[in-house]
Each structure stands twice: as C-alpha cells, then as structure tokens.
C-alpha cells in the first residue's frame, strides 16, 4: 500500500494481506484499537499489540475488509500475489514501478 495514511502510520510503504472472512482466528479483545478517517474520509480501525504497539490488523469500513500486516508472518512464502494499491496517487517520487510490474 502506497497511501499517505499507511506511510504515516508505518513509516513507509507496507505489505498488507486481505483476509477472507474467518481465515484466521485473532482474539481482537487482546489488541488495542484506535479509529480515524482515511484519506477518502472513510473510517479505518487499527488494531495493535497492547505490549509493544506493533500494528497487527486494519479494518476498512468502506470495503468491510480486514487486512493483516505481512510483517507479522513468519513464513511469507505462502503469499501468492502482490498488488500495489494507491500507487498512482501516493507513491514516493523516487520509486517508479513499470506498467508491466504494476498490478492494480
């Protein structure tokens, strides 16, 4: 994700994984949360570790989807495809991805 919100919250572009409903069992009651409006004005809910504040999940109300931060995975080889989202509007000017490499 290249969006301004992710860059400001994480400090750079991030890898996120869209979760299918019931794909993983995460006890959200053990996580801290905060809500804010994203760049589009839609509500975004962030879930983080209460001990170290590491980001765990993001919920985007507009799409009714949960996203897991890929950095949480021990084995990233299970990931099959990658897409760059919000690239056109928000990417770093020094980071150019060719049309062939860009999947949106």
Identify what each model region corresponds to.
Residues 2-104:
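A short Gly-Trp-Pro
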